[in-house]
Regions:
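Anion-binding and metal-coordination hotspots
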Residues: 1-413
Length: 413
């Protein structure tokens, strides 16, 4: 069933697209978290900090046993290395250890306990993987996330076992779905669009998404693939309402213009290193009488000064300003309104109308299958609602068309 669901989904979507003459050039992306079918109290945090502390204790113990020559001084000591050191400890002369045979036995026993604990930590870290920091005992693929509907406290601050779902919507039809274990939407845009490309053979020409996707990597990816990105950035709402305007603007001549209208040029600061390789420092002078000084320096320790240093990523700022210009165009305004209606409305139908807020199955593969069937059912439901008005002939036409599409792909051969 898992191998067949993707071709079936493609066939039905293509049938609907042909029936309505829908173009997949413009799509809308959004994500939402669905609660997992897991015991909400049986969660495990990734024990990286405890593992580092354990490695420090093991290193100190190995130094007392004169076995720390080839042991890394920083980082985590693997259980394999601890096993080798435990074997080597059997050959240590008790006279070399302060306390003799009794102290050596205690050290061996302590090293064995460290080994058992290290194996436990490594197992938990392997389950979490490199991109997660938690899992649940009854569903190892579920991740602890904060949900908007928090029935614990009602504040949305308590952790729940959940999966992060992404849907790509075009004219109310879910044309692609993606299931993720990420707690945020930022890192899901690229795999979602790559999946869209593998399913339909091309990227969409325009995509609209909210500020959760407005990162440098996503802007750069869309620019590289030739996708016109109508994607907000995190500070969009503050800038548009005027409550938190941008403190500088990056100009085409390679300089910056601050909120007070002063120009800043690029400078090199010997005793200060940029946060990233793409960053550069820009210096704005004569700030003494600036009316925006309090706002501009609100996060700085020195609230007054005659100059201000900005750390700028020119490429990211250029892409972000380009996204802002697109969002402010009439086309961008229409896209933003459509996104709120289409993709958020689709999640509203799923969660509110269909009362589908929690997965019934466990494990990532089974949950992905369940979500695919749910999206498939929603697409068929929308087709029947908008296209079919009680005429059996139309239903028969769609059934024949879909059956021919399945036979053409030879799914069950």
């Amino acid at each position: 069933m898992e191998n067949c669901i993707t071709p079936i989904f493609i066939s039905i979507v293509q049938a609907i697209v042909e029936e309505f003459a829908i173009s997949l050039d413009t799509v809308f992306l959004d994500g939402s978290k669905f609660e997992a079918n897991s015991n909400k109290y049986k969660f495990v945090w990734k024990p990286t900090t405890f593992h580092l502390r354990l490695s420090e204790k093991a290193l100190n113990l190995l130094r007392l046993m004169h076995l720390s020559d080839d042991v890394p001084k920083d980082g985590i000591i693997s259980s394999k290395l601890l096993t080798e050191k435990l074997t080597e400890s059997q050959k240590i002369d008790p006279e070399l250890i302060e306390g003799g045979e009794t102290a050596l036995k205690k050290m061996r026993s302590q090293l064995y306990e460290y080994l058992i604990k290290s194996v436990e930590y490594e197992e938990k870290e392997a389950i979490c993987g490199p991109d997660r920091n938690s899992y649940y005992k009854t569903d190892h693929d579920a991740t602890a996330m904060c949900l908007k509907e928090d029935y614990y406290s009602g504040l949305g601050s308590q952790m729940h076992a959940a999966y992060n779902t992404q849907i790509v919507v075009c004219r109310g039809i879910i044309v692609f779905y993606y299931l993720s274990q990420d707690r945020s939407d930022t890192r899901t845009l690229i795999p979602t669009l790559e999946g869209f490309k593998s399913m339909y053979g091309c990227y969409p020409k325009r995509i609209c998404a909210d500020a959760g996707y407005g990162s440098f990597a996503n802007y750069k990816y869309c620019n590289t693939k030739g996708i016109e990105a109508f994607i907000k950035y995190p500070s969009w709402n503050g800038e548009r309402t005027g409550r938190y305007p941008a403190v500088y603007e990056y100009l085409e001549d390679g300089t910056v213009s601050c909120l007070g209208g002063r120009t800043g040029n690029r400078v090199e600061i010997p005793n200060r290193h940029p946060k990233t390789q793409q960053s550069a420092f820009y210096k704005v002078e004569n700030c003494t009488n600036c009316q925006f000084m309090a706002y501009c320096r609100r996060f700085m320790k020195e609230k007054e000064g005659n100059e201000r240093i900005f750390e700028v990523m020119p490429e990211y700022v250029t892409l972000k300003q380009g996204a802002r210009d697109r969002l402010l165009r009439p086309e961008g305004i229409e896209m933003r309104v459509n996104r709120s209606c289409q993709v958020e409305g689709t999640f509203g139908v799923l969660k509110q109308n269909m009362a589908y807020t929690r997965f019934r199955r466990r494990k990532l593969a089974k949950v992905r299958l369940e979500f695919a069937l749910t999206c498939l059912g929603l697409n068929i439901r929308k087709f029947l609602k908008f296209k079919i008005s009680g005429t059996p002939a139309v239903v028969k036409h769609f059934r024949i068309k879909f059956s021919f599409s399945l036979a053409k792909q030879d799914l069950f051969a």
